[in-house]
Each structure stands twice: as structure tokens, then as C-alpha cells.
Amino acid sequence: MQSFLVAEIQNALRSASVTTGQSIIIEKPTSPKFGDYATNIAFLAAKELKRNPRQLAEELTGHFRFPEGTVTKTEVAGPGFINFFMEPAFIMQSAERVFREGAEYGKGREGQGKTAIVEYVSANPTGPLTIGRGRGGVLGDCIANLAEAQGYHVNREYYFNDAGRQMQILGESVRYRYMELCGRTIDFPDTHYKGGYIGEIAEKIHSEHGEDLLHVESIEPFRSEAESIIFSSIQKTLGRLGIVHDSFFNEHTLYTADLNGISPNQNVIDRLREKGFIGEYDGATWFLTTKLGQEKDKVLIKSSGEPSYRLPDIAYHVTKYARGFDMIINVFGADHIDEYPDVLEALKILGHDTAHVRIAINQFVTTTVNGETVKMSTRKGNADLLDDLIDDVGPDATRLFFIMRSKDSHLNFDVELAKKQSKDNPVFYLQYAHARICSLLRLAWSEIGFDAAKRPEPGVLMRLTTPEELQLAFGILDFGEASRSAFRMLEPQKMVDYMHSIAELFHRFYQECPILKAEPEIAEARLFLAVAVRQVLQNGFRILGISAPESM
């Protein structure tokens, strides 16, 4: 419906010879007395064109040529808002698209014929997944679902950090525990990983090799075994949330030289040097970001010879361009806030267009369990583990709670609320709407022989005229725009909010409008309206990655 209004507004702008660079935004008014939809395009354009906004709004309304039976009236309000009052029969007729399109209803065309890569989770294989990583995983998975809903062919990628100092520390940590099992007394470094899983890996190695590795100086046997076990565990945990990646990019390949003896990391250094953005001082190699107006240069290779995170991240992004993706989406934790702008600047210097690179930063998570906040620390061994949370509240609650607040906001995960079987729990509230519809349709089949799988006759919903029915139909029509908006903002929370509003509208309709006891034609129409809502809920649940129970 919103796309219909946008097209008509664009026609009016052209007809009135008004040229503006402002985007046309359609909103739902706070009160029905202001119409069904509204736009502030006249206000925005007038500011740009230095014109009176109310006069421009009145001029535009004079150029509207809506098809008969679609819009009952338009009115100018306030300083230049244009309100639209829709024809109820048109709303109901439009909502019947759900029956024709089914699971495809609400999908966009923005990404048709295009590819997108969404990188998310990308946790170092140094320990079990924490709750903080879980939030980024669900956020990325939902963003990938939203991209697919807009027509993109999506590649879901995990950047596998299998190189660098942390992997060395992992190997050393396991080796120390192995040596303890061999009877050696070890002063375990405070900088190393102390989780119980380290001891479990050491026990596995000890059971297979005995003391044969005691005098092996290399940590490689310990590192590789730990990496394999931990990464398998990470994939299993993600699978519990329905998160499956299409590809895994190994960081060590960025350190591997090609036939010319140059690694991707070195290639980045060489190309930035050619552009005049590499400096050598204090024993380190620096990205000369002071030339870009920043206060300090950023280290790419430390004095120890170890690359900083920025260098492989730049090289990794170069490979994404080389693979030809039309859109590059990265989902990072809050610890990347200071780093990613430098990566983008380097890519620009290297000649890459960063207009299609999107970044989603998710903030930290704390969990409240019996009124106590649990801290996360993989090295210390008292980690707040994602598996434990899933065990406690289930995968659906875990997913939805991770995205029911803006990614930009710190998330307090209320475990007690996530387990409640009441309307206060947003997961229960959404899924109960679907289960209630399924129960209604089963009852309708047994009592009046209503077949929910049957395609209704065109115009069946036009029999419905009550406010509750119309508001529910309006909600159905907003599904596609909600999905598009959530994708453009990389904000699945917007989709959660929309789904909650649909559930609320349905519950109100269910309470206020008798269904099976209504006149036969009205009963049939209301049942088909419920079928349409069920389809919208299923389509939305698919994006959010939660189940659609038929009974609760």
C-alpha cells in the first residue's frame, strides 16, 4: 500500500514540476482522524526549495489522480503534512494478495539478480560461544533473511580466525593442561584460557597419546586439536539456533603467499605504500591515517612483526570485492567500532567503492538470572555461555530476545521473562497468535466445514467493514514495507515491532468480532482474514527464524 502511495506522490511531483532530492516517506498517523497514511514530503521539499510548505502541500494535492475507489480523500494538515484516507473496500481487496502470493507475500525486488555476502559470528575458535557472540549471530542471520526477502542471493559467511596470537595462546593453554595431566607442576599464566573446556581437550589428547607429546616443543598438535574441537562445538551451538553458514573463510590464507611470493596481507601493504599511506617508525608499519585528518596513524604490523586486526580485515574485504558481491554486509560486535572506519578508508584508497558496504554493530549483552548479572570472560572460565542460555529458555526465545531491542542498544536479557507463558513474554505473545488462528481453523473445519486450504473467491474480504477488521487488513498490507524498512536499516527489531503489532491487532479482532457465530458470509470472510494473518505471521517468523506452533 505504501508503495502505491509513493508512486502516486511521485506522479504528482512530476505533474506539478516539483523537483526534489528528498525521499518520500509514508507514515501511519497517531490517530485515525488524521487519515490512514500521511507524508511530510511537501514539508521537506519546501525547505529544500525555499517555498511555503503548506502551499506546496495544497498544490500537490491538486495534482493527485488516484484511481477510482482507492482514496476517499486527501487533506493538508499542520505546516504541510498530507493525510490520505483510504477506501475500505480497496484495503480489503488489496489484502487478498496474500492468498495469491502465499509464502512469497511481502517479498521485495530490490535485490533481484544481485548477490550479497553477510558475514557474521566470526568468533575466534578459542572457546565456546558466549551470549554476546550469540546476539551478533542472530542479528546477522536475520539480516541475511531480510536480504533474501528483498530478492538478493545471499552468501552467509563465517570469517574463521585461525591465525594470530590468540590461537597460539589457545595451543599453549591446552599444552599446559596436558603437561599437568602428565604429572608436571605448571604455573598457569593469567593471560591464558582457563575454561574447563581447555582441560577436557587436554584429557582427550592425553587419552590418545599418553605422554608421547610431553617433549614436543611445538604447540601445533595442541592448537590444531583444540581448534577442531572448539569449532565443531561452535557450529553445533549455532545449529541449535538454526544458524548455518554457506562458506568459511580461513584467516591463515591471508598470510599465505601466492605464486609470486606475495600474500594478500602483503599486497595490501604494497598497494597502500604506492598510494603514499604507509609509514615505518617505532619498529612498526603504520597506516598513515593522519593524512585523512585523523589524530593518530594506525598500526598495521606491530613491532613484534604480528599484524594488527586492521591488516587482515582490509585484506579480507578485498577478497569480497574480488568475488563480485553487489552488497557487502558485516555484522560486528561493539569492539569493532573504532576499527571498521579505518578498513573502509583503506578500501577507498585501494580504489574500491564502499557505497555498497553496510556495517551493523551490535552492543553488549548482560543476562539477569535470579536478579544477578553474569559477566562474560572466555579466558577466565566463568563465561556466560550461549548453550546454557538456549538450554534455559529455548531457541525461539533466545533468538527473539536478542533482536527485540535495537542493535545499537545494550541488551539486558531477562531470563525469567523469556520463560514466562504469558502475554508479557513477546515470544509467547507472537506464537500464541499463530496457535490461536490454527485452533480457530481446526474448529471451523469441524463445526462448519471451512477449508482453510481453499483459495477464496475474489472480493470475499470486501464484506468486512468493522474498525477491527480494517485495522487488521491495514496491518497485513504493511508487511512488505516493514521488511524493506528493517533491511534498509539493518534492524530486525523493526520486524519484531511490526509482528507484535499484527499479533495485537489479531487478538483485538478475535475478541471484538464473533467469527463462527456470525452470519455465514461474514463468518467465511472473517475466517479468510484469519488465514491471511496466519500467512503473514508465518512469513514474518521465517525472517525472524522462530517456529510457528499450531497449538500451545
Swiss-Prot record:
GO terms for cellular component: cytoplasm. It is an enzyme of class 6 (ligase). Pfam families: Arg_tRNA_synt_N (PF03485), DALR_1 (PF05746), tRNA-synt_1d (PF00750). InterPro entries: Arg-tRNA-ligase, Arg-tRNA-synth_N, Arg-tRNA-synth_N_sf, ArgRS_core, DALR_anticod-bd, Rossmann-like_a/b/a_fold, tRNAsynth_Ia_anticodon-bd. A motif ('HIGH' region) lies at residues 123-133. The keyword NAD does not apply. Keywords: Aminoacyl-tRNA synthetase, ATP-binding, Cytoplasm, Ligase, Nucleotide-binding, Protein biosynthesis. One of its GO terms (biological process) is arginyl-tRNA aminoacylation. Gene3D superfamilies: Arginyl tRNA synthetase N-terminal domain, HUPs, Isoleucyl-tRNA Synthetase, Domain 1. Its EC number is 6.1.1.19. Transmembrane segments: none annotated. It is found in: Cytoplasm. Its main location: cytoplasm. It catalyses: tRNA(Arg) + L-arginine + ATP = L-arginyl-tRNA(Arg) + AMP + diphosphate. GO terms for molecular function: arginine-tRNA ligase activity; ATP binding. Belongs to the class-I aminoacyl-tRNA synthetase family. Monomer. This is Arginine--tRNA ligase. It comes from Chlorobium luteolum (strain DSM 273 / BCRC 81028 / 2530) (Pelodictyon luteolum).
